């Protein structure tokens, strides 16, 4: 029950200290995000990667700071519960005119649950649902930018409007030929619109912040005409060197203004599917300067209605808010469904126990207590690998995960087979009890990773085999899968990631047909591996031996040995050798390793090469 009077002398001080802690967090988060513009302008790619990694750690650091302050100044953990009731009410009052209330509520939950005992994690003490609306939040300060800008082109001035639209972002680096690129965009927009009549409300709306990731900046907006809306994005890149030209860089890998090239609009992406791939859960988080993040999320959701708000917050780098919203969505789904959790279909992993709820598009992964001898690893090492992926550029090829502790599920929703599986392989991670004292038995998982469910690649291929490889549809499916598999590995190589275990079962197919890796317990940095050719046998005995007769170090990798594990099917082998035979050659890996060690940052495009203007409009510019 909430108190009728706010009579505690310390409750307001605790609430104020907590909101001060959040404001400090978001100020630092926003400052780091805004600096991405300068790093893009100066081609500081290594700085951009470093900032993306470090920003992920900001939230936990600020939560820890706030918790320490509350304990030191107010002995917060010793305060009675009626004081904590009042703290929450004061905190709600402080959020009335706040520009990030939903993030501040989540921050309150994080700090409170760090201080209070779990038995107090009830609706009265934390924000189970939002208390403050995020609708129509606006910054009324005269110097504040609106969330988005609107432009009203006509048939006659579309080209000039697009030039102004890009110039309004104020990039401090010259374009190679902005008028030419704006012409390409205008042509692409005209083709997309077709012969429709331009209505009275015809306009282009663009979010006022550029979206920065890796070596690109993205204009994100939508075209509105009558009752129709078309989402779009314009990738802006530094001009690439001509084939064979290598741009010199200093010791930090930063190219000079003249060397790195001028800016170009590289493509025009249209429609929800293109945007969903751009904002995919398998890519690194964007850096974008947002005063009112909920307004950005609302705008993006209007463009991608199939994308959960939780994943949009994740894509914007606000992973803790994404985690909060995901859990709320999960509880809502549980309340409105009746199916049971089960052991996930597919080949069981040696390190992870995986289960799912058929009606829910995610899987739950628990680290096992015991591993077979060939898996020389520990729980902490596995958690370290998942953290590495979280902080790394996932280049659209590694699934993002959400990490949770002490997650409670209704016992009646778990199949007995699943309970037996957890008791056998991960007993330390399982508790079955009435923890809340409400008479309902719960399954409590101590530590779990949650990620998007995909079709395992081995199952996808088996479906084609079962259909019959002589059938054109089956052969097309095999070709798409194998080509995408090789592309996925090469994209990961470009990001300095060696997957370790390259078996088909460790990759999945997304709804857009992309192949994504999701088994991280053996990943390594490419630069930490030693890629070798298998030595020439010394004699006939070596050649005929079924055992490895040569020395193998802990980080040694022999690419030519991948074939027997991957290419047992003739149809698969034919496609693989046609498109990706280089993956079986140690020289391929050594070459990429050397370039990464030399400071080169590869380009990985979140769209098809055929959509690039340099491809569509010929060799007029290097691209």
Curated annotation (Swiss-Prot):
At the highest ranks, the source species' classification is: Bacteria, Pseudomonadati, Pseudomonadota, Betaproteobacteria, Burkholderiales
Please name the catalytic residues of this protein: 400
Q: Which PANTHER family match?
A: ISOCITRATE DEHYDROGENASE KINASE_PHOSPHATASE, PTHR39559
Name of the protein in question: Isocitrate dehydrogenase kinase/phosphatase
Transmembrane feature ranges: none
For this protein, what reaction is catalysed? L-seryl-[isocitrate dehydrogenase] + ATP = O-phospho-L-seryl-[isocitrate dehydrogenase] + ADP + H(+)
* Sequence positions that bind ATP: 344-350, 365
What this protein is reported to do is described as: Bifunctional enzyme which can phosphorylate or dephosphorylate isocitrate dehydrogenase (IDH) on a specific serine residue. This is a regulatory mechanism which enables bacteria to bypass the Krebs cycle via the glyoxylate shunt in response to the source of carbon. When bacteria are grown on glucose, IDH is fully active and unphosphorylated, but when grown on acetate or ethanol, the activity of IDH declines drastically concomitant with its phosphorylation.
Keywords of this entry:
ATP-binding, Cytoplasm, Glyoxylate bypass, Hydrolase, Kinase, Nucleotide-binding, Protein phosphatase, Serine/threonine-protein kinase, Transferase, Tricarboxylic acid cycle
Give an example GO molecular function: phosphoprotein phosphatase activity
- GO BP: glucose metabolic process; glyoxylate cycle; tricarboxylic acid cycle
Can you say where in the cell this protein is located?
Cytoplasm
Q: Which family does it belong to?
A: Belongs to the AceK family.
Gene Ontology cellular-component terms for this entry are: cytoplasm
